[in-house]
Amino acid sequence: GARCAYTVDGGRRGEVETESFSADAMTVMFHGFNTHPGYAKGRMINAIKVAADFIQLLPRDRLTPETTGGDEGFVHPYTMQAGVERTSVRLIVRDFTRPGLQVKEALITRLAEDAVGRHPGSRATFEVEEQYRNMKEVLDRYPEVAEYAREAVRRSGLDVLEQPIRGGTDGSRLSFMGLPTPNIFAGEHNFHSRLEWVSAADMEKAVEVIVNLCRIWEERTPAGSRPIGRVV
């Protein structure tokens, strides 16, 4: 089987990416009590209003996708299903370290409990789902996998560009499944927006890098022990 792999899913020409976010999804379920609104005095507990208070308590000028960059993580509420009896808020949590994820998830829990405290009789339950982890944790143990990619970029006449991915790739999961998988550029821009586009010239250059990468593995690996590489 393969000893390593490379995804071709990056942006600017020359990029070699070995570090990604660590990512969790978190669901906060707010529980209220529904009854006939005409006779609800002193009885109804509206879970929608509890959730609204929770969202109001979330940070606005920090820890959000629109206020963070570089090595900063964030908390992002992205969808909700609302009803008087139950309202769920789905969030994604991103950081480059596992402790950073835990700090942000503890913040979400505390703010949700603060919102519940404003509405006697309501309660909140929490569910955390692991999505992927920072592939750097694995790739640091196999430095030649990324170094060969850097050399392939240089052989193609490009400068190597490296910075953490503020997102994830298939390599984020593959690396933790035992297949160290850095990411190589493909000329993609404006990811996940209505204005997403890809450069044909950069795609051609990415192919050249892949060919050089295959040659480097051939050169550096003793005959009889050559790994089977994959390009995803």
Features from the language model and the residues they span:
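Metal-dependent amide/peptide-bond hydrolase catalytic core
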Residues: 47-232
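Fold-level recognition of mixed alpha/beta catalytic cores in primary-metabolism enzymes, strongest
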Residues: 1-47
